[in-house]
Amino acid sequence: MRRLLDAWSGIPAYVRNGRFDVVAANKLAMALAPLYQPGRNLVRDMFLDPAVRVVFPDWPEIAAQTVAALRASTDSRNAELAASLNGSDEFRRLWALHDVRPARDETKRFLHPYAGMLVLRRQSLAVAGSDLVIIAYQPEPGSPSADSLADLA
């Protein structure tokens, strides 16, 4: 999978497991957002890393989607992850809603300190026989986001 991620040098891409841990990422994904570093946990960082709120201008919606995806996950370790986040008022509030829906491919806005606002389409690919998912973000061809992403690469 490492070679695949590296071959996609023009689009940010990373791999996460069923516990929402980032297990691999290409350079552009790591440049796009701090939470796409291998070893980071996407759910934990969504609520405990203040820098993530800056990266996602639509943080309230993305946080709600993240909690709903955590509830939809079948990984038994996620109950422990949810319990570890009870110190976050926002997480507790969203968890109490009992919204359950898997992560979906959609357009997300990223605010990068050098590249500015990037509008990217999320695409996910499940890795057969594992709990791994490859996530890639693509700009609309010819858009300002495509130009900014190319500069970031």
Regions found by a protein language model. Give the residues of each.
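Hydrophobic protein-protein interaction segments
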Residues: 2-153
